[in-house]
Swiss-Prot record:
<feature type="binding site">
    <location>
        <position position="14"/>
    </location>
    <ligand>
        <name>[4Fe-4S] cluster 1</name>
    </ligand>
</feature>
<keyword id="KW-0677">Repeat</keyword>
<dbReference type="InterPro" id="IPR017896">
    <property type="entry name" value="4Fe4S_Fe-S-bd"/>
</dbReference>
<dbReference type="InterPro" id="IPR017900">
    <property type="entry name" value="4Fe4S_Fe_S_CS"/>
</dbReference>
<feature type="domain" description="4Fe-4S ferredoxin-type 2">
    <location>
        <begin position="39"/>
        <end position="68"/>
    </location>
</feature>
<feature type="binding site">
    <location>
        <position position="21"/>
    </location>
    <ligand>
        <name>[4Fe-4S] cluster 2</name>
    </ligand>
</feature>
<dbReference type="GO" id="GO:0016491">
    <property type="term" value="F:oxidoreductase activity"/>
</dbReference>
<dbReference type="GO" id="GO:0009773">
    <property type="term" value="P:photosynthetic electron transport in photosystem I"/>
</dbReference>
<feature type="binding site">
    <location>
        <position position="54"/>
    </location>
    <ligand>
        <name>[4Fe-4S] cluster 2</name>
    </ligand>
</feature>
<keyword id="KW-0004">4Fe-4S</keyword>
<dbReference type="InterPro" id="IPR050157">
    <property type="entry name" value="PSI_iron-sulfur_center"/>
</dbReference>
<feature type="binding site">
    <location>
        <position position="11"/>
    </location>
    <ligand>
        <name>[4Fe-4S] cluster 1</name>
    </ligand>
</feature>
<keyword id="KW-0249">Electron transport</keyword>
<keyword id="KW-0560">Oxidoreductase</keyword>
<keyword id="KW-0602">Photosynthesis</keyword>
<feature type="domain" description="4Fe-4S ferredoxin-type 1">
    <location>
        <begin position="2"/>
        <end position="31"/>
    </location>
</feature>
<keyword id="KW-0479">Metal-binding</keyword>
Length: 81
């Protein structure tokens, strides 16, 4: 099952989510929109196991990284039974 990983622009570039991910789904990429000049990116969402460790590691008040499990994604799209 494929999960959706969304990175929000509230990312502060701390790398905590990248280090917490056991399957290397996340990586940091250059971005001038925050103090750290980098932001998390999720180029390998097909490897996401849905553990949400990245969410737990995020230090921002509004989670900058969110994992939507496949059943949550289909429900929000009106595709679940």
């Amino acid at each position: 099952m494929s999960h959706s990983v969304k990175i929000y622009d509230t990312c502060i570039g701390c790398t905590q989510c990248v280090r917490a991910c056991p399957t290397d789904v996340l990586e940091m990429i250059p971005w001038g929109g925050c103090k750290a000049k980098q932001i998390a990116s999720a180029p390998r969402t097909e490897d996401c196991v849905g553990c949400k460790r990245c969410e737990s590691a995020c230090p921002t008040d509004f989670l900058s990284v969110r994992v939507y499990l496949w059943h949550e994604t289909t429900r929000s799209m009106g595709l679940a039974y």
